[in-house]
């Protein structure tokens, strides 16, 4: 029995050197980049986004954080994961902050407590810690607290202390520790 050679022909649409299997995606890409001056790596990420059938509105979110390719890729990843990337598609955020917000979205944390560029990376991690451990993060998710102060407030919450007296950003870490020590003695 003779084997038949089968030939398959596929149409490929090429725009600016990028290959698309679907005309719609190629046309959307072409329209999106028209009269805009993107760098080569930005075009690659934008092309990848359109190849995933994203609409121009979603691609705009990706471009908004450019020209940083790591930020653009993280926004693309979040969109493909059906996350609300509006929480971190913000040019003011550092990539590490964006990654922490992405982590929170993936893990169903209430990212609205820390999805803000006013928080340092360490402050964000302290808030995430509280969310993961079911602490009352609203007791310390104020950017006026330093990371070290947040740690003291967290410690007080974990020890079951009423931390109201500690919620003063003017207190030094040493003062907070002394107050916590007195509260622990009163608790016994």
Predicted segment positions?
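General marker for long, soluble alpha-helical cores
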Residues: 2-188
